[in-house]
Amino acid sequence: MTTKYIFVTGGVVSSLGKGIAAASLAAVLEARGLKVTMLKLDPYINVDPGTMSPIQHGEVFVTEDGAETDLDLGHYERFIRTKMSRRNNFTTGRVYSDVLRKERRGDYLGATIQVIPHITNAIKERVIAGAEGHDVAIVEIGGTVGDIESLPFLEAIRQLAVDIGRNNALFMHLTLVPYLAAAGEVKTKPTQHSVKELLSIGIQPDILICRSDRAIPANERAKIALFCNVPERAVISLKDVDSIYKIPALLKSQGLDQLVVDRFGLQCGEANLAEWEQVIYQEANPTGEVTIGMVGKYVSLPDAYKSVNEALKHAGLKNRLSINIRYIDSQDLETKGLEVLDGLDAILVPGGFGERGVEGKILAAQYARENKIPYLGICLGMQVALIEFARHVAGMDGAHSSEFKRDTPYPVVGLITEWIDEEGKVEVRTEGSDLGGTMRLGSQLCHLVEGSKVRALYGSDTIQERHRHRYEVNNTLLPKIEAAGLKVTGLSADKKLVEIVENPDHPWFVAVQFHPEFTSTPRDGHPLFEGFIQAAGEYMKRHLN
């Protein structure tokens, strides 16, 4: 079957939730038995978001094949079963980089390189490659219609719709329909102007998703349909909801999936949303609440830890517990003291980079260890747990990571000096290597030790988890740390690198080098987070009694 394309654009303002709306539609189409994939086209000049500040951009989502991508790909994987790859996200910078490399190589035979056709052709080629082998490809264009940065992408999808035939392409536009309290009504003019902007570049939207804080009345939807030249049934009201996992059912109730199926002439059954109904039921009916302290350096923007936040909530669903995440700036532990950790049922230290706030994270790991509070360390969260244990239990005073202190007497964590690149070649890295694309990335095999907590949680002796780091546990200092009581319970495929450590003298103290949050979904959860939240619930009950 010819792949059908749904191009998703946004207008009026940014942060309307294009990614979640697109992923929700994908979930309903998948529930109808269609093979669906999603792509995100980002208009910034960075080659990828790998070196961008999480406070500016939010989290970097890592795919199975090791691509550093936009956090929207995390939404895609949480809503549909299809796994994303480096083909599912690309930026203006990546496209220009490819085109310029071809120009230097002489591929264009002396032609003048222009946005049209060279850049737009490169965009179209990447979209087609990413969509290959699927019934439906939903392609989200980052940014807002009217932004200068988005123009090459919008021109490329306009051309692509012509190339593949309009019966194989559909344009879905998200807009804001604000409510003015003074007038006591919603206003449609911003939507009309946004569509006018889209029309000026040759794109007539087929479906309008109208975002608002309330349901949009039928008469206003009719008005939008009239002025924006779309059928009334193609004006979808998407009001604010208390859970993003309600959106698939909300879109289905307005017939959006049927509209798409009819437009493309697809033969498929009705959508079965039973799994999503179960998620919503679990979310609405918790039996208790636990407070998780997330100790990090990017806590001013919770989206910097988007997948961790969601993974905790997924584990809450499985344990029938409501999750209250208390964001704690790790520097506050250094300046305000340990009282900021009072009242927590568990402590989580997520990944991060740079020296700022590291001592606060080490204090959090020490507090959790000494007070028997459930602890989950992720990536840097494992490294600080190791440093803390080395300093205060193993007698290695001044132990640190060479990332933060070059002259530490005990570099218990050190730089990966040799790694395998995307093409399978050995790459030597030093302190002076580029920051972009020089990490251990993607899904890696991990061996679990028999009798360990993680072996019981996963129910398997090998697992696959995703990595994003350039520093590893220093094996030469490991025997002394293990002799003091910390146990290595997970090892890399070649059994040379430490992936998981546990403290057997603690009710629940697990720290991992990988990022388990990237594989957690609302329907399936993740065993590590489920075990962590279960331990938090047990800790909460013990202290209530």
Curated annotation (Swiss-Prot):
Annotated CTP binding sites: 14, 147-149, 187-192, 223
A biological-process GO annotation: pyrimidine nucleobase biosynthetic process
Catalytic activity: UTP + L-glutamine + ATP + H2O = CTP + L-glutamate + ADP + phosphate + 2 H(+); L-glutamine + H2O = L-glutamate + NH4(+); UTP + NH4(+) + ATP = CTP + ADP + phosphate + 2 H(+)
SUPFAM superfamilies tied to this protein: Class I glutamine amidotransferase-like, P-loop containing nucleoside triphosphate hydrolases
Keyword list, A-Z: ATP-binding, Glutamine amidotransferase, Ligase, Magnesium, Metal-binding, Nucleotide-binding, Pyrimidine biosynthesis
Principal EC category: ligase
Residue span(s) of domain Glutamine amidotransferase type-1: 291-542
Protein name: CTP synthase
Organism: Tolumonas auensis (strain DSM 9187 / NBRC 110442 / TA 4)
